[in-house]
Amino acid sequence: AGLFYIDRENRMSHLRHTEQRKRFRAILNGAECLSPASVYDPLSARVAESVGYKLGILAGSVSSNTTLAAPDLIVLTLTDFADQVRRMMRVSDLSLLVDADHGYGNALNVMRTIEELEHAGVSAMSIEDTSLPIRYGRPEGKDELFSGGETVGKLKAAVAARRDPATVIAGRTAALKVEGTEKT
């Protein structure tokens, strides 16, 4: 197929996304360690796929850099992020893991994040426990974490919002960086 060819009946199907998610789960359960391609737009996803990658990763910082030419200060909205993912998945069959940052807010926002990103076609997403955006006046270089209860609540909300059981939802923590080895 040419560079601009899009099979609309196949490329946009939710069945296709489920197959990509199942492939991601098979990779997780396999014995082989695979490195994902760092992808950030439709062209990079297509190039990664053309050279043999089956797995892609989209970091929140990379998305902010490439979409807005902005630093990773949570100025990229969920809508911006989901639209970028949707454009990538429209032209690629990669199983895509995305960094969903802190879920774009509280547990209700996390539910919408899951809905939007799942609909966009991601195979897996991570949600972190770092309090974002960065609170004004916090000590320089000192990240803050959500409470354990809030983090667990957000992850439970994420799982409850998931429509496709093949979608992987992962929690990610900065506890070692923030708290050190004594508390973790």
Q: Where are the predicted features?
A:
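N-terminal amphipathic alpha-helix/helix-capping segment at the start of soluble metabolic enzymes
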Residues: 12-38, 46-51, 156-160
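Active-site mouth loops of central-metabolism enzymes
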Residues: 28-43, 74-75, 97-109, 144-146, ...
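Structural preference for beta-strand elements that scaffold enzyme active sites
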Residues: 34-36, 54-55, 95-97, 124-126, ...
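Hydrophobic residues within beta-strands of alpha/beta enzymes
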Residues: 48, 56-57, 117, 125
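Glycine-rich, proline-tolerant flexible connector loops at the mouths of alpha/beta enzymes
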Residues: 56-80, 100-107, 126-149
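Alpha-helix-loop-beta-strand connector modules within alpha/beta enzyme cores
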Residues: 70-98, 120, 140-170
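A short alpha/beta connector and helix-capping loop motif
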Residues: 107-128
